[in-house]
Design a protein with these regions (language model features):
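Non-catalytic accessory segments flanking enzyme active sites
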Residues: 49-155, 166, 256-288, 292-312, ...
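Hydrophobic beta-strand positions that form the internal "hydrophobic ladder"
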Residues: 98, 163, 209-210, 269, ...
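A flexible loop/linker signature enriched in serine peptidases of the S9 family
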Residues: 103-110, 143-148, 167-176, 191-196, ...
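Beta-propeller blade signature
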Residues: 114-117, 178-182, 226-238, 283-288, ...
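Blade-edge beta-strand/turn elements of extracellular beta-propeller
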Residues: 134-140, 182-194, 239-251, 289-301, ...
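Cap/lid segment of the alpha/beta-hydrolase catalytic domain
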Residues: 141-154, 166-172, 186-189, 446-592, ...
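Polar, glycine-rich mid-to-C-terminal structural blocks
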Residues: 230, 234-274
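Active-site-proximal cap/loop segments of hydrolase catalytic domains
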Residues: 523-745
Length: 745
């Protein structure tokens, strides 16, 4: 049975629409361009009286509409059923302890568990302690009554006896680090505040850890102040965090940040020096002798490539890089003479392959005579593939068999291990955990998925237009066939070298099981095909991302067939199929994907049946003035540069709106404590779109309270948000719930 379709969805307006937002134009010349900003006042913090009143009025109107949408409560029930199943991360061992992150289903936050190894063989894949041996080590669900405090960072000492953990509140990027003793579960109560955009790295003796901290922001500006001037600091246990010494900082380069790595033998501190979200970085190294950290030397400092630290093996630093290899390779750098006057020689260990090398895990090699492996995760048309190589010479050993179109979110091992654990998930299957013995090349199932939706079909095509081919996953029930009216959600991101890969999301499952089509696009600007693919969708080429999305929309709706065609990559998809029509097609995306939605909405409103930009970057002239927004200039350009601003104004959704034009039904979402993409983007865009709208379709703004960019949001808030979005899309795209929809429990 296919989807039940309402051929002409009724337009639902707020019974009491909010009053039009006050227009108070600010006119200024920025980088040679005259810009009029009528809603500048909405950039004030969410607790500003005028902004708070605007949010309250908007929420009252949107909640009245969303709560009354047909099937909204049933959708929430089905979302809860899809969410209410046990989930486990990949376990890992340090010293005499095993660790694993778990969730029993509807817990607001994931919980860290631990168990003593009790002499279990670390080389045997899946040789975990009995489940009854595990106990809770950290439960963030006990940290706040509202469930908004999250466990947002973990670092286990080399001997496993201590865990540094980071707490975040209300979805903020700000972290508070502390330490818990594994055996006693005693929390040290030494809160390290004003840290963000950095993990922690333990000293080898467990006496302290390195982290990235910032100067405290001005009072009242914690969610808005610019994030510049990160310092690498050292916290020694038992000391006052306020006195933590600065180990390394660059006052002359306040945009730099430092990701610390301590070699397993303690001889080196290796820094990945990042510059915002720029696709290149630097590597700086300091020797460590007699417990003292020496001066940092620039090892790879040209800023012309990306380097990811894998670890120190013998005397070599192993790195993944795209230097002279746009799809990635593994190289080694000799660290025996850091003061050598000549540039370091990069010795190739694993060469570039036809598929993008996305991530590598170094396992084993704790001693010079110990075997060591590289577990390489590549992307083949946005689907994960795993291969094992010998770490010292790079020789290929074997592949790991993976079940179809999947993602491998994590691979865990250790420098004393001979096996790895990995998590696997797909569009129709939640996370499972596998173990893999690297010596025997044997894979075992440790934790099966909670269920597998066998009635769901996953196909993939490449949509060709303008000489480029864009991968597009098509996810639907087996009985749903192209008939030019299937309610369809097109989801995309297209930025910052982030690959969009198969993932299990309860909301996607509910949509597909109801008879809708989910179309997930791997747009330029993302990380699906390496550096060139990213470069072709950023800066002056950023509009290629929106071209790709609208080409996918055209193929799905049978438009522009003289310009757009498809080839099949996976499954039995028909490249000539017409799946839907514009009024049954919605577009959805988050963060940079929210920009994608806003750009498609303002470019081609007639191509869409609805639009859902979530926590989106929507004012491209002022993003750099708040928190970490300046860092996004790597993809967007600098709004204070005349040439860059000219490009930005061509697609900035807030500035592309045309009063008197008819726009499709739109639901805009944000969180009032979002300090990644501050809420001003969504507030200003909603006010401007409501003012510009000349058609009958509603424009709703939904602002979550005590909620940030998305991470750490409690389950109840997530279920409410997803139910509202699904109900909005179902209503406006013409999808009604099937009475026989499977419970998945």
């Amino acid at each position: 049975m296919g989807a039940a379709i309402d051929p002409e969805p009724a337009v639902t307006h707020p019974p009491h629409p909010p009053p039009p937002a006050r227009r108070d134009p600010v006119v200024e010349v920025q980088a040679g361009h005259r810009i009029v900003d009528p809603y500048r006042w909405l950039e004030a913090p969410a607790d500003d009286p005028d902004v708070a009143a605007f949010i309250a009025e908007q929420n009252a109107a949107s909640r009245a509409v969303l709560a009354a949408l047909p099937g909204r409560d049933a959708l929430r029930e089905r979302l809860a059923a899809r969410t209410d199943h046990p989930r486990r991360g990949a376990p890992w061992r340090r010293g005499d302890w095993w660790f694993q992150v778990r969730n029993d289903g509807l817990q607001d936050q994931d919980v860290l568990w631990c168990a003593p190894a009790e002499g279990g063989a670390p080389s045997a894949a899946g040789a975990l302690p009995a489940d009854a041996c595990f106990r809770v080590l950290l439960d963030p669900n006990t940290w706040s009554a509202e469930g908004t405090a999250a466990l947002s960072g973990l670092a286990v000492s080399e001997d496993g006896e201590r865990v540094a953990f980071a707490r975040s509140d209300a979805g903020s990027d700000w972290l508070v680090w502390d330490v818990v003793d594994t055996a006693s579960r005693r929390v040290h109560d030494e809160p390290v505040r004003w840290a963000r955009f950095s993990g922690a790295a333990w000293l080898p003796d467990g006496s302290g850890y390195l982290y990235g901290g910032y100067p405290p922001p001005p009072p009242g500006q914690a969610h808005a102040a610019l994030a510049r001037g990160q310092q690498l600091r050292l916290h020694r246990l038992g000391t006052d965090p306020a006195t933590d010494p600065v180990v390394h900082a660059r006052a002359d380069r306040p945009e730099w940040g430092f990701a610390p790595n301590v070699s397993h033998d303690g001889r080196f501190i290796v820094l990945e020096v990042w510059h915002g979200t720029h696709p290149t970085n630097r590597i700086h190294v300091a020797p460590r002798r007699d417990g003292q950290i020496g001066a940092f030397r620039p090892l790879l400092d040209a800023g012309d490539a990306r380097y990811t630290v894998l670890g120190v093996l013998d005397d070599d630093l192993l790195l993944v890089t795209d230097l002279d290899a746009p799809l990635g390779r593994v190289v080694a750098v000799d660290l025996t003479d850091l003061d050598a006057p000549t540039p370091p020689v990069l010795r190739e260990v694993v060469s570039e392959q036809p598929d993008r090398l996305e991530r590598v895990t170094l396992v084993g090699g704790s001693g010079r005579d110990d075997a060591a492996w590289l577990v390489c995760r590549r992307l083949h048309h946005a689907t994960a593939r795993l291969a094992v190589h010998e770490a010292r010479g790079g020789a290929y050993l074997h592949d790991l068999d993976l079940p179809g179109a999947v993602t491998v979110p994590s691979v865990t091992g250790g420098r004393h291990a001979r096996s790895v654990h990995l998590t696997v998930e797909g569009f129709a299957s939640p996370v499972s955990v596998l173990g893999h013995d690297l010596e025997q090349a044997l894979t075992s199932l440790v934790t099966p998925p909670a269920f597998a939706a066998e009635e769901v079909v996953v196909e993939q095509v490449r949509v060709h237009h303008d000489g480029v081919a864009v991968p597009l996953f098509l996810v639907h029930r087996a009985e749903v066939v192209p008939d030019a009216r299937v309610p369809t959600v097109l989801w995309g991101y297209g930025g910052f070298d982030v690959a969009v890969t198969p993932a299990y999301r309860p909301a996607w499952d509910v949509w597909v099981d109801a008879g809708g089509l989910l179309a997930v696009a791997g747009l330029r600007g993302g990380g699906e095909y390496g550096r060139a693919w990213h470069d072709d969708g950023r800066l002056a080429r950023k509009e290629h991302v929106f071209d790709d999305a609208l080409a996918c929309a055209a193929w799905l709706t049978g438009q522009r067939r003289d310009e757009v065609h498809a080839e099949v990559l996976r499954g039995a998809a028909d490249p000539e199929a017409v799946w839907t029509a514009p009024r049954h097609l919605g577009v959805e995306g988050r963060s940079n994907g929210g920009l994608l939605v806003g750009a498609c909405l303002t470019r081609a409103p007639e191509a869409l049946g609805c639009a859902v930009p979530e926590v989106g970057v929507l004012d491209l002239t002022r993003f750099h003035r708040f928190t970490i927004g300046w860092a996004w200039s790597s993809d967007y350009g600098d709004p204070d540069d005349p040439d860059d601003l000219e490009v930005l104004l061509r697609y900035s959704p807030y500035h592309r709106l045309e009063p008197g034009r008819s726009y499709p039904p739109t639901l805009i979402t944000t969180g009032d404590t979002d300090d990644r993409v501050v809420p001003m983007h969504s507030l200003k865009f909603a006010a401007a779109l409501q003012h510009a709208q000349d058609g009958p379709a509603p424009v709703l703004l939904r602002v979550d309270t005590s909620a940030g960019h998305g991470a750490g949001k409690p389950v109840a808030k997530l279920l409410d948000e997803r139910a509202d979005v699904l109900a909005f899309e179902a209503h406006h795209l013409g999808l009604t719930l099937r009475s026989d929809q499977s419970p998945r429990r």
